[in-house]
């Protein structure tokens, strides 16, 4: 990749931002070596790696990379047999712990959507040596301290050292506290010189205290003497400390040997940990920049949606949409100074470099980038004092180099192409340069002040105009890029706003070529029409948003109403079902009493009693009818009934039950329907004709009803295919009929299925007043798919 382009596009500043996200020197090595890649497959993989890291950070927060150290040199020393110091071993243990935890947390997860093949492939490659990790932590407390737990020998030596120290101190305390020695001592204290215990003796009493002089004070007034009585004890202490040091060296050597045995795996871990740190650094930077993974295309076009320059303040930067490479290969941008032209072209160039480095770009989802073989940029004033080159010469030297190396797969960026020389010649050179680049097929973005380039873009195929917007009212740029609109000079308008007289402005216009004036007028009209179109589009979008909002509110209210309706229907059905069951229980009692009375001899008193019970039954059914009717939410039949006759069989849609028509009111379009022994007045629209008609004489006595039932009621009922609620309604109606018909035993067919229907029905049968007993079907009766019921 062109080094000059990397510099002028400030690629190094992106690298500096990335470095701040690294957790270790291993990750920094990868970042420092990062350069844009030109291989499509590799770039795609690099971008996916960044996306995986970004997603994991968002889900998990901290990844746990803290504690990684660069241990390669230490591991290599252990491999050749060197003994490592405690600090080095602690660093190795820390790095092993990070590797183990990363492998455990990234390789497997209980989260269903935790699927990150690139990151997980890296973490799965990490070697785990928890035994080495544990032994190092068990043996070493810090960089300067070995634990007593390192070995039983070390623990014993240190115990003996402590005892010997105590013995020496006790002996010295007895010396310094004795009246004999007190006058010889400078202070009643015990000191150490080297690793020998001494007492401070006044120099004039040197001959009075037998011992070895180890030191003296700066004034010479005090001598530090090791009394002869403890010399042997100090020697023993010295021997113990030498033994301690030997044991420590043995322990460190043993731990170092363990590290050396797995040195290749640990060095492999270093590479993987560095790669993971690098990947998560990219993920962190993406989150900071609110970056996205651009779609990568092989057609050499870019489409940046609301791209934001990554080095500018996120709160102030203006997002711009930029596209290049499909309908046109060259984009010519015009507009005022400080209007954002340079920032715009730098954004495009930097996005290309970032994408090819596997970094996310701060833009909206749906942005698309491609892989260029090179990115060339000529931006800024880089005149060379050493080479005595002018601004124009400096730019032209760079442009010559670009033209010599550009290919069809390159991206070229020019800032103020042709500037720094005579405007006429500069414009001509600029057009010629763009022609040459366009003929090669490279993609190019150029900024300019020359109106000749605007005319060139208007007439040349494959070249498009663009402008940075300028607000005449505020005399300030808006930094918005408008592709397809050539930039307009605002010198006259700005001058008028600043107070320049119309006379001077008119005189100035006389010195301009009439063609240029006409072009400026056209551009002014285009700009007015564009602003009007933008306003109309914004108004249309506002209205669309309001309509969408109203639609959402309507859908929410409709959903709420439907939910309320369904709840009301379910509640009504439940209450109706409860009322019907209660009524049936009352009817059962009355029928039972009627049958009991009919078995006795008739008498006036008994006949009167029967008549009262029949009236009570009629009253009960009559009071029940409007209650149930009012609670049932009407359902309309698919086929409207125009005419009904008494005796016809109909289906009551609201109850999902069949009944017989007793009487008909054609004017009100209502019919009295008998369902079992219950009568209800229902509208035609809630009824549906069935194929089978039955004749029912509603004036028959209870005895005749019982006799007619006995001939028509079957000794079995098939409930298969019904849900539990429907089955309960059906079986209770059937048991009423069977009981009235005088059947002694019936078969309830429910099937095997999941067992829910069978269990629910058997529970209802246990509580039914007509049921004497029940049992499961036997072989030949239907087996587990039926229940045999004995009636009272």
UniProtKB/Swiss-Prot annotation:
GO biological process: mismatch repair; negative regulation of DNA recombination; rescue of stalled ribosome
InterPro entries (UniProt xref): DNA_mismatch_repair_MutS_C (IPR000432), DNA_mismatch_repair_MutS_core (IPR007696), DNA_mismatch_repair_MutS_sf (IPR036187), MSSS (IPR046893), MutS (IPR045076), MutS2 (IPR005747), P-loop_NTPase (IPR027417), Smr_dom (IPR002625)
Gene3D superfamilies: 3.30.1370.110, P-loop containing nucleotide triphosphate hydrolases (3.40.50.300)
EC nos: 3.1.-.-, 3.6.4.-
Domain of life: Bacteria
Binding locations of ATP: 335-342
Molecular function per GO: ATP binding; ATP hydrolysis activity; ATP-dependent DNA damage sensor activity; endonuclease activity; mismatched DNA binding; ribosomal large subunit binding; rRNA binding
Top-level enzyme category: hydrolase
Keyword line: ATP-binding, DNA-binding, Endonuclease, Hydrolase, Nuclease, Nucleotide-binding, RNA-binding, rRNA-binding
Boundaries of every Smr domain copy: 717-792
Protein function: Endonuclease that is involved in the suppression of homologous recombination and thus may have a key role in the control of bacterial genetic diversity.
Complex formation: Homodimer. Binds to stalled ribosomes, contacting rRNA.
Alphabetical list of HAMAP family matching this protein: MutS2
Family the entry assigns: Belongs to the DNA mismatch repair MutS family. MutS2 subfamily.
Name by which UniProt lists this protein: Endonuclease MutS2
């Amino acid at each position: 990749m062109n080094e000059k382009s990397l510099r002028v596009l400030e690629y190094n500043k992106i690298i500096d931002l990335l470095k701040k996200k690294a957790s270790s020197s291993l990750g920094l090595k990868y970042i420092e070596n990062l350069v844009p890649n030109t291989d499509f497959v590799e770039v795609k993989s690099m971008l996916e790696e960044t996306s995986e890291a970004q997603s994991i950070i968002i889900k998990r927060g901290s990844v746990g990379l803290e504690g990684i150290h660069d241990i390669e040199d230490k591991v290599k020393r252990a491999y050749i047999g060197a003994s490592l110091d405690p600090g080095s071993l602690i660093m190795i243990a820390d790095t092993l712990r990070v590797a183990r935890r990363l492998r455990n947390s990234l390789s497997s997860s209980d989260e269903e959507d935790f699927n990150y093949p690139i990151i997980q492939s890296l973490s799965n490659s990490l070697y785990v040596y928890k035994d080495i990790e544990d032994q190092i932590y068990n043996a070493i407390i810090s960089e300067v301290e070995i634990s007593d737990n390192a070995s039983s020998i070390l623990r014993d030596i240190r115990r003996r050292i402590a005892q010997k120290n105590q013995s020496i101190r006790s002996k010295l305390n007895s010396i310094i506290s004795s009246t004999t020695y007190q006058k010889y001592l400078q202070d009643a204290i015990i000191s150490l010189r080297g690793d020998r215990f001494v007492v401070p003796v006044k120099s004039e009493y040197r001959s009075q205290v037998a011992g070895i002089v180890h030191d003296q004070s700066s004034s010479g007034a005090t001598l530090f003497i090791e009394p002869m009585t403890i010399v042997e004890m100090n020697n023993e202490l010295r021997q113990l400390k030498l033994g301690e040091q030997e044991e420590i060296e043995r322990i460190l050597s043993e731990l170092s040997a363990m590290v050396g045995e797995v040195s290749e795996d640990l060095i492999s871990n270093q590479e993987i940990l560095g790669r993971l740190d690098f990947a998560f650094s990219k993920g962190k930077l993406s989150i900071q920049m609110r970056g996205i993974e651009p779609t990568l295309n092989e057609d050499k076009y870019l489409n940046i949606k609301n791209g934001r320059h990554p080095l500018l303040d996120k709160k102030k930067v203006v997002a711009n949409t930029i596209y290049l490479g499909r309908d046109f290969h060259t984009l010519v941008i015009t507009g005022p100074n400080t209007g954002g032209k340079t920032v715009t072209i730098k954004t495009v160039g930097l996005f290309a470099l970032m994408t090819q480095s596997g970094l996310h770009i701060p833009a909206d989802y749906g942005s698309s980038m491609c892989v260029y073989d090179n990115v060339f940029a000529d931006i800024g004033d880089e005149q060379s004092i050493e080479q005595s080159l002018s601004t124009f010469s400096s730019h032209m030297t760079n442009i010559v180099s670009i033209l010599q190396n550009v290919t069809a797969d390159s991206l070229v960026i020019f800032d103020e192409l042709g500037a720094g020389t005579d405007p006429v010649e500069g414009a001509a050179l600029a057009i010629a340069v763009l022609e040459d680049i366009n003929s090669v097929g490279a993609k190019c973005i150029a900024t300019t002040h020359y109106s000749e380039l605007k005319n060139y873009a208007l007439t040349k195929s494959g070249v498009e105009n663009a402008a940075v917007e300028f607000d005449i009212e505020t005399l300030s740029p808006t930094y918005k890029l408008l592709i397809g609109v050539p930039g307009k000079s605002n010198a006259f308008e700005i001058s008028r706003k600043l107070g320049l007289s119309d006379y001077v402005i008119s005189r100035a216009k006389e010195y301009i070529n009439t063609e240029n004036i006409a072009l400026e007028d056209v551009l002014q009209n285009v700009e007015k029409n564009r602003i009007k179109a933008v306003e109309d589009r914004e108004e249309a979008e506002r209205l669309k948003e309001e309509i969408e909002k109203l639609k959402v509110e309507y859908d929410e209210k409709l959903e709420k109403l439907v939910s309320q309706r369904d709840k009301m229907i379910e509640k009504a059905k439940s209450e109706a079902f409860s009322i019907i069951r209660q009524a049936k229980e009352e009817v059962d009692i009355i029928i039972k009493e009627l049958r009991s009375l009919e078995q006795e001899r008739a008498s006036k008193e008994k006949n009167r009693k029967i008549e009262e019970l029949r009236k009570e039954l009629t009253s009960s059914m009559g009071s029940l009818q409007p209650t149930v009717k009012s609670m049932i939410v009407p359902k309309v039949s698919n086929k409207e009934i125009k005419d009904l006759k008494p005796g016809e069989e109909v289906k009551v849609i609201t109850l999902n039950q069949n009944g017989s028509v007793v009487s008909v009111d054609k004017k009100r379009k209502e019919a009295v329907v008998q369902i079992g022994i219950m009568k209800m007045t229902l509208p035609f629209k809630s009824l549906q004709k069935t194929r089978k008609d039955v004749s029912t004489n509603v004036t028959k006595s209870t005895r005749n009803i019982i006799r007619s039932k006995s001939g028509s009621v079957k000794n079995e009922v098939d409930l298969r295919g019904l849900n539990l609620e429907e089955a309960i309604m059906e079986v209770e109606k059937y048991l009423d009929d069977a009981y009235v018909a005088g059947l002694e035993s019936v078969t309830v067919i429910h099937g095997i299925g999941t067992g829910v229907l069978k269990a629910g029905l058997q529970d209802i049968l246990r509580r039914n007043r007509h049921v004497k007993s029940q049992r499961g079907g036997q072989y030949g009766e239907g087996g587990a798919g039926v229940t045999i019921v004995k009636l009272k």
